[in-house]
Amino acid sequence: MNPTRLILVRHGQAHCNVRGIVGGPRGCTGLTDHGQHQARQLAHRLRAEAPITAAYTTPLRRARETADIVADQLCSSIITVEDLREPDYGDADGQPWADVVSKFGRIPAKHPHQPVAPGAESWSAYLQRITAILHDILSQHSGDTVLIIGHGETVTAAAHLFLGLTPSLRTTAAFAVHYASITRWEQQPLAWTRPAAGWRWTLLAHNDTAHLTG
């Protein structure tokens, strides 16, 4: 049986990232010119590597624009999954991050169970949603190579799922996830001498940006 492989990539640089704006459905206006360039470099690298069996993207514009560029190079369709979206920020969507944090009155990373604005989703609620959909997608693709184009939070959520991390970890540690970076996980045997013993997820690469040349 072939191992299941998961390739996670973050979208290219977006206007909301540059402006420091909360980039939900209202705040996200897509990729910058540089972000489009990053997405093209990402697409060229993915095309040169092992074939991808299935590909998914989050619905936010910056991720979909990245996915469109990648799909053109891979000559394949990419499925948009609503529940892969980043945390819902409610009334904070489209507002400057500095203003949102000031109104919240606390450092968000220290309060993973509290939403930063009315109608928003807490970090712990987001993790519950995203890890469930990641598990669902992977259960449909045993032995396949799966690509997911998402956000920094998507990459972090996968680590929480595979490593059994808790939401409170956000207070003491974080994962660097750069624009258009690649993170790879693969299911490998618990014991190479006894493959029937089961599988576990192994991190092969994290935040790989070797394809970004400028």
Where are these regions (language model features)?
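Short active-site segment of divalent metal-dependent hydrolases/proteases
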Residues: A14, T154-V155
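Acidic, low-complexity terminal tails and accessory targeting/binding regions
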Residues: M1-T4, P87-A98, D144, H160-G214
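Phosphate-handling substructures
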Residues: C16, D72-A132
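Active-site-proximal alpha-helix that buttresses catalytic centers in soluble enzyme cores
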Residues: N2-T4, V9-S76
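Glycine-rich phosphate-binding loop signature in dinucleotide/nucleotide-binding domains
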Residues: A48-P51, I137-D144
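Short beta-strand scaffold positions
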Residues: T57-T58, Q128, I149-G150
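Conserved histidine-centered catalytic loops in small-molecule metabolism enzymes
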Residues: N2, P51-D83, G105, E186-G214
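Generic beta-sheet signal
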Residues: L6, D144-G152
